[in-house]
């Protein structure tokens, strides 16, 4: 009898161990895809990218890190982060995580660096897929290697280009082209091809993702899906007839850039939008329109921005990220001379300071973000993981992350995090997210209330 009881205990212990291993490793028997996006809003091109990525990688689960209420190019998200989360989940993604605002409105380098830090910390991601204007990821990898290693020849060319008074992106583009051409053994070196690659917004972000993956010695495997239809900033629309036969594209009516869709929303051309977004995205967009919760662009906050800039001392403007070399004086003068953002941008922009950089500076002023804040975001090795929403599969992923990586700061309850977290750097970073939402909601026509981060819980999607 004693022998039987002893054997039974051993058997139970064995199966408990097997169960624990399964709980810890079960999802890792499957493959997980990671996507970094703005989804502003989620449209047919995004659906094409997602479904193509799943098909190529044969993954079972998908995690998306999305920007919140403001974007990397220094503007507003046209709909709030919870509505974007609903769109994302409705279209098949399992888990949605917010990219903190200190990353999401930063330079392409810091945007990518922050997103990769979060993805890598999860410990469950097998693939990262990003959209690009080329299908040749090897070229992007080669460019990222140059930017990561910064060989002397490249650094000399970069300094030379910056000394011409060019903006950093343009100077870097020219330096890269010069370095690649000088280093190439190909007598038929196609400078036009490389120029198009280096100057395209999605390629630039893709290169930064690759650089960050190398920086953090990540095991995540990158893939790129060539963009279909219109370019990133294009306001044109492409019908499915514009493409070669593709089983995914043939399910879609038309593909237009997020820029085109946002312009159509401003023009109230809702019938055209219907063809450019999945039906679920369209329904959510219409709900936001009816609720008065569309925030089309930074012009919504025009008066607030000019009030802040006029109130700020020149020294305070100089402390805004991306402000250097006396730009603060031009900003202060223009803020007192104009009351229109478009006029302001036109007068201050130069070959050194691009419109996108200036828009980000305006956003930094609006959201009270300083150079010190951006440096803090770079210093944080493991940012918090703010869960915006999940489906049943996504819920399993969250449990898997919590079980395997208890050191990660998972935010599933904002109040609990604010009340209990003792990491000062994470507190400062999260306070910026909360304030950004409070400012964003002032752009609503109706119900422009504060504290939405505390009032809106996790979006739990069920089919």
Give each language-model segment a name.
Residues 54-55, 89, 116, 120-121:
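Non-catalytic positions within long, well-ordered alpha-helices that form the structural scaffold/packing
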Residues 7-28:
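Short, Lys/Arg-enriched N-terminal segments with co-localized hydrophobic residues
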Residues 26, 99-463:
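Active-site cores that bind ATP or allylic diphosphates and position pyrophosphate for catalysis
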Residues 57-59, 93, 124-125:
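Short, high-confidence coil segments that cap the C-terminus of an alpha-helix
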Residues 86, 90-100:
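A glycine-rich helix N-cap at a beta->alpha junction
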Residues 27-84:
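N-terminal catalytic cores of NTP/NDP-binding nucleotidyl/phosphoryl-transfer enzymes
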Residues 1-7, 12, 60:
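Short terminal hydrophobic/aromatic SLiMs and anchors at protein ends
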